[in-house]
Amino acid sequence: MKTKSLKYIFAAGLLCCGISTTMTSCSNVLDEEPRSTYDPSFFNTQTGIEGGLSALYAHLRYFYGNGYYLNTLETGTDEYTYAQSADGNFKDADLSGVGSVTPTSTVAGGAWGELFTNINTCNGIIENGTAAGFSDALLAEAYFFRAFDYFILVQTYGGVPLDLGNGKLKFNTTTNRTSVRNTVPEVYEVIFADLEKAVNDLPDNPRMTGTATKNLARLYLSKAYLTYAWWLENPNNIPTYPECSRDASQAQSYFQKAYDTAKTAIDAPGPYGLMPTFYEVNAAQYDRNKEIMLYADHSENEKFGNGGAGYGWGNGGSPENFAYWMETWNYTEMTALSTAGDTKVYPVQRETYQGLGRPWTRMAPVADAFLEGGVWEDDVKAIDSRYDATFTLRYHTNTAKPGANAGAWVYGANGMKINSGEVYFSFVDEATEANIDWTPTKAMVKNGDKTEEQEVTRFNFGKLPGRADFVRSVKNISRKCYPINWKISIARTDTDNSFNNFVNGGSPRPWNVAKFSEFYLIAAEAAVKLGKNADAKEMVNVLRARAGKMTFNQNDNVAVNIDKSAEMIAATPDVIDIDFILDERSREFWGEGYRWFDLVRTQKWTERAKTYRIGGNGFTDTTLETVTRDIPAGYYLRPIPQGQLDGMEMTAEEKANYQNPAYRN
């Protein structure tokens, strides 16, 4: 990139934070060795190329697992809105009148700087790797990541520069302050070429745990073909930038390529495959399983496992994996009547247990998704195990655990006793809302020197006959109280002391970037566009049949043996359309950072996200309000970051023309 700002990002992001790896180690994982300084000549050495290769994987930590990046991909969609404690970063992304998207918003920044830094690293490896004695298979990892990064950029911003200062796709070592954006087709030409080379040269099996393979490259190649086909077809006349012609008649050939590439991987999966149940895909004890093809890795190792950040009090910045904080409401504010019957205690306290963790209350799921007509409507909840394995719906007390200091049990609904480990609060389905007794549960409670009548739960939770747990229906989801995304939550192995300060740090779990299951949905989407309904139905039913199987109910924390695969397949519509594909993608990848790309690709963002319902910010808000978003066609591209424009020495007119049209002053 011919810009001062990107050059500075390059210097800080790569040369001072590079990682070398010992390729000859007996270990099957990357041996990371932090280094304090590099200069560009480092890439002329074998050690430099090795360090660059390791840095390609390390760079994933700087946006995957970052809560602000996740916000740009989820808030403002039909999955998430801003929550009660949200700041302007989240309100801007919602497009509902409480903020605005500008070139200075975090929505604009995304991963722009990190991606271009890594692209330049890839260029350096590709230029110098052969002379340093590296095989085509190793260099193919750089080709893969260059395409990977450009694919994110072209989906987010439209056309972006291929010349970073020394010529097209050349390694740049000098500071330049001008830049020219290439067109979308020109960027995709590079993406396709790089991924096709990666498919050809990468091994079938990873050289180390988590490294790139042929089928990983096929996943992104099939998705790039699919996305470009939609761009060519442009069914809703969404503008692109820089302006260029597009031939809709070519779209079908790219849909076919997407289908064929995905099907090739499905038929010859290599070391990958589907886990037996959806729960096993995302449960912490199965991390790095065969369904996960790429991840931004973390571990409990204090020195290297979190990019050097450690696991004490987290500050909410990369390379920490802190994204789950955003989708976690402050469940610790619930109160309960203690064993003594005259004081309040906190029945569910934060701990390093999957489904809980540190609550920041920045992003809340829209209620519509859980109600009739939504992806998680009651008919889906009844047979689809993905519902249980996506959300924390029941909140178990942890009062008797070491450090909780809240007693062996508390009083629950209907005056019933709840022991430590049992459920204190639950979200129930929409139909059950009609049976909830909303009469406040009150008791005489000590308040300093006084004893006064108070509502027990603080949230004025409801009650159901014969149940000890307090409840709200999904019809009562609010910005303050909502189901947590269980899949991405923290988990640690040192659970004997789960109330330690690690609960306030980043998660030591890897962030899943690519899943083998997506092949089926890419193939299904392409088949719909090709008019091959039977093929589309076959692909989605593989995942739906799996979703009907449950061997562990994580909300009840109990082993089960349930198979509703037949019901899931029977519920598949006879005719598969794009809306059903989007529903399935939401059920499979909810809250993981896929959604904005999915809605933009299919040009369904406005249609599916223009209105939503949710309750208010208060503890007792349970009534849904309808909110309207303004999503103009120009917003299908994000703004070029203001820092990029400020760093360029170009005329005001040239800078204005560099910016995407919807965000010009």
Placement of each model-derived feature along the sequence:
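Flexible, polar/acidic helix-loop-strand segments at domain edges
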Residues: 361-514
